[in-house]
Amino acid sequence: MALSELALVRWLQESRRSRKLILFIVFLALLLDNMLLTVVVPIIPSYLYSIKHEKNATEIQTARPVHTASISDSFQSIFSYYDNSTMVTGNATRDLTLHQTATQHMVTNASAVPSDCPSEDKDLLNENVQVGLLFASKATVQLITNPFIGLLTNRIGYPIPIFAGFCIMFVSTIMFAFSSSYAFLLIARSLQGIGSSCSSVAGMGMLASVYTDDEERGNVMGIALGGLAMGVLVGPPFGSVLYEFVGKTAPFLVLAALVLLDGAIQLFVLQPSRVQPESQKGTPLTTLLKDPYILIAAGSICFANMGIAMLEPALPIWMMETMCSRKWQLGVAFLPASISYLIGTNIFGILAHKMGRWLCALLGMIIVGVSILCIPFAKNIYGLIAPNFGVGFAIGMVDSSMMPIMGYLVDLRHVSVYGSVYAIADVAFCMGYAIGPSAGGAIAKAIGFPWLMTIIGIIDILFAPLCFFLRSPPAKEEKMAILMDHNCPIKTKMYTQNNIQSYPIGEDEESESD
């Protein structure tokens, strides 16, 4: 018995020092965060539309009995002086006649259009803005929160912020499940932004500090971004199918259970009660923001993701308007983009280091732009498969190239403390998801969905040549002097915090000597 307990304790200690387990935690955190991000994409436009029209139907039904109660028991027929006709007031006939006179325009529209086609185009156009603002609220809050989380990780380490992200995301998921008004949905979406900021900034910073070799770091970040891709992949079809066949609450309750599982693993492995500050002071955020190479990498992340961010609120509404798509199709339409993003991040997480990350990002930006330009030509859901596949694959190329470059640029040109630089990367990601839905909804309402796609497609293509400057970024003078003095390639371990290999847990810490 004692031997088995000792073996269990030893296994726990080894697990807590495992870099692969840390990678799994970050993978799972990004997976669930992005599932919650995208599960609402097919649900919210249809749900808000149904809320509004159910309310209208309820008002009509409550107004109708006032007329029927006074006449139903007294008369078997009524002569109308308006059109010189006699109406029989039996149950079925009375209901039909009154329904026709009270809501004739609604019946006409319903009979002319299939049930899956919304009947009022004006409502859909207005919903572009409403849905866009709801989707953008998460990214806007995350945008504001990211710099503070980056500074916080430098002071207290990564475990506490990433665990705080789990707690906030659980509350947000429960709110989504039981919210029945636009205001509460907006609060839930905004709250998710704070949780996402904690998870993504702390998660990517943790990976950068644990995996110090540039090539190895690129590989594991490609795997971690695979978690993001899986969330984006599973979210829309998962949400749309459960929404249509079970109800709005079901997908969020399933997600809440998965989030609890993630929290239990974090609690076991990361021990988030322990404060683990960095061993050296990182480069100020303002200095990083003045670095043109970091800005180019951040711009690539921003504009590439802005394309899919504009699609999320606008594409389902455009499909409802032009294709009479059913609820489940609104989510399945994003499936090609999600699958190809997963493929892209896993392939180019490894390949980008060999072919040149700058070239990978440049080609990705061009493919994103061309694919987005092709989307408005689709006549049905099958016509969306190829362009959406291209969008997802290309964004996977950009993300899997630019995320490792952010860490590489800090190693090369600044102090190797990663919280702030990955806060900038996440800010860029969030700017795409903040500006994209809010501006995209307004543009789609004003000039139409095809012009919206044309604008963002051209922007992506025009930005692509800037990635050439990332081909061989120069090192700072003091870094170059160190490299020349030691006459060796870049070894990021010489700049990083002490005890990286045993991070984050491990009581027996060994100091590294040069």
From Swiss-Prot:
Keywords: Cell projection, Cytoplasmic vesicle, Disease variant, Disulfide bond, Dystonia, Glycoprotein, Membrane, Neurotransmitter transport, Parkinsonism, Phosphoprotein, Synapse, Transmembrane, Transmembrane helix, Transport. Changing L37A: Abolishes binding to dihydrotetrabenazine. Changing Y422A: Reduces dopamine uptake. Changing P313A: Abolishes dopamine uptake. One of its GO terms (biological process) is serotonin secretion by mast cell. Changing M403A: Reduces binding to reserpine. Reduces dopamine uptake. It catalyses: serotonin(in) + 2 H(+)(out) = serotonin(out) + 2 H(+)(in); dopamine(in) + 2 H(+)(out) = dopamine(out) + 2 H(+)(in); histamine(in) + 2 H(+)(out) = histamine(out) + 2 H(+)(in). Changing R357A: Abolishes dopamine uptake. Changing N305A: Reduces serotonin uptake. Changing F334A: Abolishes binding to dihydrotetrabenazine. Reduces binding to reserpine. Abolishes dopamine uptake. It holds the Pfam family MFS_1. It is linked to Parkinsonism-dystonia 2, infantile-onset: An autosomal recessive disorder characterized by infantile onset of abnormal movements, including parkinsonism, dystonia, and poor fine motor skills, as well as autonomic dysfunction, including abnormal sweating, cold extremities, and poor sleep. Some patients have variable degrees of developmental delay. This is Synaptic vesicular amine transporter.
